[in-house]
């Protein structure tokens, strides 16, 4: 039985709580409340009802027959988190945490967002429960994800552009934590990925593991077996932990697809496992992209949801233990995979999800036709249309 996190919030040497003293008590209160509610049947019933009646679960498992035939190898199945209310897996966690905040007596939430999907999910959950919502978002991401910014505002959230650093997810998270330090008495920090100080990586994983649980049962029903490989994109890593969790104790190969940007041998990438070293970011010990002096190197990816310089501590442990393999996918490879899926299956994936698709497509070609690859299609690509228009005008991503 998989034993992590341990009682002090560690995954081997990774994880923990590296935060100002001001936040130790709020974190302990959140951990205590979550432990109490985790096994509460009333809480579970309320959460499941929201997922089924409001978010639209269970999400579909789609056999990508035309792209599988085109590649000539393994069968490719897609776990369709893009079909969730708000368009991605992020709503699974947002609804869980807003319920937790409600049980703790909070009425205000703060959130960070990169691609805007978590911001939209948090704003949606806040609107549903009548909470005040403040979302921190890097100014670079505000520009490239303007549709999601407008969606958040329509949902009643305040969006705070962050101008420090590169104006991306890391910087938005920094500002969200600073704000929480000053307002932790009446605000709940609704974090969006399996990152940050304990208990957040654990909480987010628990609210996302329904992805893998559903997919496992659905695939057994359709194929009578488990997948040979499971592939998911990894920034912070919540959709990946959500789908991997159900297969950790199975004989299934697990692959995380990181953002290689312009290439891992250039300065323009967000490949934390490939190029990172041990350090502390946002309250957690993990791998991060840093220089010899411990200063964080600004990450880059065409995908706003993957350009994070760290990775969830559980992913760091799973890499070091060898249980999960992490591979890098460039911008061009992701865009090519996005185009192929769109043109063969009529499904427009998020650029984040396209990183997982690219790796799955590459592997499928060299596998027998009776083998199965399960891909976490973490979100839909509507939010990326402006980015895609700019990129494709330059002829990027024209082949797989």
UniProtKB/Swiss-Prot annotation:
Pfam families, per the entry: PALP
Pathway: Amino-acid biosynthesis; L-tryptophan biosynthesis; L-tryptophan from chorismate: step 5/5
Descriptive protein name: Tryptophan synthase beta chain
Positions of modified residues (N6-(pyridoxal phosphate)lysine): 90
NCBIfam families, per database record: trpB
The species this protein was found in: Bacillus velezensis (strain DSM 23117 / BGSC 10A6 / LMG 26770 / FZB42) (Bacillus amyloliquefaciens subsp. plantarum)
Tagged with keyword Ribonucleoprotein: no
GO MF terms, alphabetically ordered: tryptophan synthase activity
Purpose: The beta subunit is responsible for the synthesis of L-tryptophan from indole and L-serine.
UniProt superkingdom: Bacteria
Stored InterPro entries: Trp_synth_b_CS, Trp_synth_beta, Trp_synth_beta/beta-like, TrpB-like_PALP, TrpB-like_PALP_sf
């Amino acid at each position: 039985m998989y034993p992590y996190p341990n009682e002090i919030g560690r995954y081997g040497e990774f994880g923990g709580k590296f935060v100002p003293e001001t936040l130790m008590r709020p974190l302990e209160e959140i951990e205590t409340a979550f432990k109490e509610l985790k096994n509460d049947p009333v809480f579970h019933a309320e959460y499941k009802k929201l997922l089924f009646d409001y978010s639209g679960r269970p999400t579909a498992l789609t056999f990508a027959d035309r792209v599988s035939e085109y590649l000539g190898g393994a069968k490719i199945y897609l776990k369709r988190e893009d079909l969730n209310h708000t368009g991605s897996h992020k709503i699974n966690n947002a609804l869980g945490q807003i319920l937790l905040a409600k049980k703790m007596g909070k009425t205000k939430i703060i959130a960070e967002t990169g691609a805007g999907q978590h911001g939209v999910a948090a704003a949606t959950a806040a609107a549903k429960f009548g909470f005040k919502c403040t979302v921190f978002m890097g100014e670079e991401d505000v520009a490239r994800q303007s549709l999601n910014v407008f969606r958040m505002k329509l949902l009643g959230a305040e969006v705070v552009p962050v101008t420090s650093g590169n104006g991306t997810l890391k910087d938005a998270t920094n500002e969200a934590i600073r704000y929480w330090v000053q307002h932790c008495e009446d605000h709940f920090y609704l974090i969006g990925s399996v990152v940050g100080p304990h208990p957040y990586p654990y909480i987010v994983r628990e609210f996302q593991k329904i992805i893998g649980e559903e997919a496992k049962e659905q695939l057994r029903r359709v194929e009578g077996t488990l997948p040979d490989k499971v592939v998911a994109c990894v920034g912070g890593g919540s959709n990946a932990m959500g789908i991997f969790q159900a297969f950790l104790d199975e004989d299934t190969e697990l692959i995380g697809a990181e953002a290689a940007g312009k290439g891992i041998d250039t300065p323009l990438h967000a490949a934390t496992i490939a190029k990172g070293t041990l350090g502390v970011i946002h309250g957690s010990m993990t791998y991060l992209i840093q220089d010899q002096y411990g200063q964080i190197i600004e990450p880059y990816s065409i995908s706003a949801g993957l350009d994070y310089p760290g990775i969830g501590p559980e992913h760091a442990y799973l890499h070091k233990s060898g249980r999960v393999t992490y591979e890098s996918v460039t911008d061009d490879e992701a865009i090519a995979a996005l185009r192929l899926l769109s043109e063969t299956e009529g499904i427009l994936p998020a650029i984040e999800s396209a990183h997982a698709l690219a790796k799955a497509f590459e592997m499928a070609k060299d596998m027998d036709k009776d083998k199965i690859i399960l891909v976490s299609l973490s979100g839909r690509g509507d939010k990326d249309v402006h980015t895609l228009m700019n990129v494709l005008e330059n002829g990027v991503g024209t082949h797989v």
